Structure formats: structure tokens, C-alpha cells
């Protein structure tokens, strides 16, 4: 599926401001200001300055929470977004109940205790982010994520993403589920991308971020076959 740019000149703007460059700027800025996030049972609230808030928006990390403070901005991050910034980019700090979580193991265990499928979803999220896709929540489409080639203000999302694992949820177990998902994503001009996240059996690492090394990600795009596309031209003899 070709990118569907939202306005004339959007493609040129995207080429002039690649996502990887903006993420690099964000990483540098957050590291210098020692941005601090506060972990709750469902998300992370990150306290930043106006400049960092703008960079986070350009990179599509989190959502702005409206507050009364003029100088401070509060950004609500999902667990996957927060751990990516903490573990992969190493540019923010996070605390829980007033105590700073000094290493990734503490944060990993805390997030895993709050969200049962955190490991699988984070592996899928980081897999896509590492390929410079913009990753957002897919809740409104009944999927885990939606992904964009660039900022959503420039281009429409191309894929609706479902994350599957062995022994995980029961989605896409029967043909009717697959048919419904494909029809739904097709109705909003997206392709259905299924990420199969599987791991080797290694119980010693399950509570550690090191277990991410044992996961593999297989990508599979599912599309609806249209008979009209393969019919012969009726005018031919």
C-alpha cells in the first residue's frame, strides 16, 4: 500500500525531516534536562519543558495532559513508550512511590506486574519503532497499534497491528475473526499486519528485560482477496 499523504507538499516535508533525526534530537534534549516520569498502574506521567513537549509530539511519544502550570508540560506515556525511552534510548528517569527506579530490571518487573502482556507488546512496539515507524494506540480500531510512515499530521496510517504469541489471547483463532479484522481495517484504508512474537523457553530470564533477546518477531500481512482483480476482461475473445 502506497503512503496516503494528507496534503500537497507533505511528502517533501517528511523527507526533509526524517523521523530518525527528530528522535535523535529528542534523545539529546531529554538526556540533558534529566526528564523524570512517574509510574502508575496504567501509564507514566512525564514532566518536561515546553521544548521537550514539542519534540515528543513531533516524534509521537505520549499525549499532552492539560494542566494549570505554564512552564511545565505533562505527557502521558504508555508503558511501551516509557520503557522504550528509558531502556532503548536511555533518556528519561522514572520513579515509583517517590523512589527512583535506578535500573531497567526494577522498571521491567513493575510494568510486568501491572500489565500481564507487557513483554510481548513491548517487543512488538520496539520492533516497529526501531524501523522508524511511528507507533500509536490502535484501540479505536480494535487492534494493538496503528503505524505511520511519518507524523500523523502528514500521512495516514498504513497498518493496523495485532500482536500474537503462542499461548496468548484467542484472537484470529477462527476464520470469522480474521475476516472481521480484515474487513474492519480495509474499511478505514489500512492493511492488517500481524506480528507473531515468540520466545525460546528460558524461565530464568522471564522477569528480566534480557528475555527480549530470546524473542523473535515474524511479520505477516493479511489482505482480503477480491475476485474482481483476477477476472478476465469480458471484452476479450
From Swiss-Prot:
Keyword Transmembrane among UniProt keywords: no
EC number from the UniProt entry: 4.6.1.16
One term under GO cellular component: nucleus
GO terms under biological process: mRNA processing; tRNA splicing, via endonucleolytic cleavage and ligation
Highest taxon in the source lineage: Eukaryota
Keyword ATP-binding found: no
Subcellular location: Nucleus
SUPFAM superfamilies listed in its UniProt record: tRNA-intron endonuclease catalytic domain-like (SSF53032)
GO molecular function: lyase activity; nucleic acid binding; tRNA-intron endonuclease activity
Keyword annotations from UniProtKB, A to Z: Lyase, mRNA processing, Nucleus, tRNA processing
Entries under PANTHER family matching the protein: TRNA-SPLICING ENDONUCLEASE SUBUNIT SEN2 (PTHR21227:SF0)
Role description: Constitutes one of the two catalytic subunit of the tRNA-splicing endonuclease complex, a complex responsible for identification and cleavage of the splice sites in pre-tRNA. It cleaves pre-tRNA at the 5'- and 3'-splice sites to release the intron. The products are an intron and two tRNA half-molecules bearing 2',3'-cyclic phosphate and 5'-OH termini. There are no conserved sequences at the splice sites, but the intron is invariably located at the same site in the gene, placing the splice sites an invariant distance from the constant structural features of the tRNA body.
Protein's UniProt name: tRNA-splicing endonuclease subunit Sen2-1
Organism: Arabidopsis thaliana (Mouse-ear cress)
Lineage of the species this protein comes from: Eukaryota, Viridiplantae, Streptophyta, Embryophyta, Tracheophyta
Gene that specifies this protein: SEN1
Amino acid at each position: 500500500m502506497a503512503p496516503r499523504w494528507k496534503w500537497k507538499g507533505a511528502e517533501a516535508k517528511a523527507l526533509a525531516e526524517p523521523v530518525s533525526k527528530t528522535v535523535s534530537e529528542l534523545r539529546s534534549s531529554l538526556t540533558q534536562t534529566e526528564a523524570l516520569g512517574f509510574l502508575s498502574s496504567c501509564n507514566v506521567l512525564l514532566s518536561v519543558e515546553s521544548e521537550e513537549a514539542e519534540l515528543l509530539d513531533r516524534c509521537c511519544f505520549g499525549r499532552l495532559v492539560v494542566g494549570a502550570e505554564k512552564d511545565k508540560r505533562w505527557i502521558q506515556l504508555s508503558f511501551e513508550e516509557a520503557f522504550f525511552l528509558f531502556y532503548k534510548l536511555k533518556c528519561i528517569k522514572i520513579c515509583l512511590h517517590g523512589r527512583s527506579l535506578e535500573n531497567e530490571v526494577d522498571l521491567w518487573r513493575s510494568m510486568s506486574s501491572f500489565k500481564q502482556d507487557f513483554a510481548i507488546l513491548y517487543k512488538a512496539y520496539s520492533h516497529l519503532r526501531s524501523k522508524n515507524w511511528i507507533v500509536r494506540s490502535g484501540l479505536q480500531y480494535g487492534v494493538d497499534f496503528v503505524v505511520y510512515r511519518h507524523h500523523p499530521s502528514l500521512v495516514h496510517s498504513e497498518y493496523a497491528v495485532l500482536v500474537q504469541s503462542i499461548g496468548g489471547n484467542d484472537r484470529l483463532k477462527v476464520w470469522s475473526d480474521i475476516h472481521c479484522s480484515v474487513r474492519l481495517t480495509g474499511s478505514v484504508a489500512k492493511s492488517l499486519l500481524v506480528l507473531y512474537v515468540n520466545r525460546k523457553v528460558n524461565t530464568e530470564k522471564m522477569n528480566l528485560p534480557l528475555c527480549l533477546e530470546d524473542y523473535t518477531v515474524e511479520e505477516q500481512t493479511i489482505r482480503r482477496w477480491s475476485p474482481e482483480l483476477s477476472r478476465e476482461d469480458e471484452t476479450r475473445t
